[in-house]
């Protein structure tokens, strides 16, 4: 059986490709720094049918059928999923076939859930094109859609065969989208790997946008944090909840803003909020609270939200999937 040379998978010979194993219910690897089209060939061989799912505005040059879904959070609805199911049926995909998800976190969330639910589970490969997708949405096997009651309330755990991270996608992103993705990277620094925060010391958003070596190091470290946590607690029964740092308020802000605020922007605000709350409770030092503000402001991320919205935000947070017995629960940190 032909296998693609690992050397030919490299997007840029100046860097070494990084591989991060994820030992979930089905072990797979996250490949970072590869040429996604070359790496994808390994997964296309021997497949009778392959269908790609991507967003409406996205153009991909693949000689396979492509299902388009609406851009942004509008693509994560029951109505969109129903249409995807219809198209999968028209293409007559069966359990031996493959779904390829090419896009940001909303695409990998929706496509992964389509793969999880079609014929009770078929294979899929994630090709994230945003930083948020690379370090968060595409890694860990969480798939799903939103409902009228909140974000990500309907879904399944269904790991991909592989996650293929081609860093050249970052050049296609706006500064705002780079910043939003970096919020998830910063989160990994605060919850687990302080080296991420050290790498970002005295770095601006422009530095992150232009420094490919820095991108590789940051994404590799953030993926490694999530992979280690997911490998220990795949179905979020205890440790994995730490990945929701900043997300309880963050998800509420997204919903309140009708998703005008990016996921990462909302998470940045959520991290500042819980850092302040932790300091009030006496479990986090003022210096670490200030470090939140320094890093997030340097990346041009928001650190506050409209005060008058708080009653509505409390209502949304009560519906958060981490809430128990009617109590809103936050993930907090006490140190790095």
Where are these regions (language model features)?
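ATP/NTP phosphate-donor binding region
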Residues: 16-98
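Short glycine/serine/threonine-rich phosphate/pyrophosphate-binding segments
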Residues: 106-113, 134-135, 252
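A glycine/threonine-rich phosphate-anchoring loop and its flanking beta-alpha core
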Residues: 113-206
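C-terminal charged capping/lid subdomain of soluble metabolic enzymes
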Residues: 183-185, 283-335
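Oxyanion-binding "anion nests"
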Residues: 204, 208-257
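Small-residue-rich helix-loop
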Residues: 267-269, 273
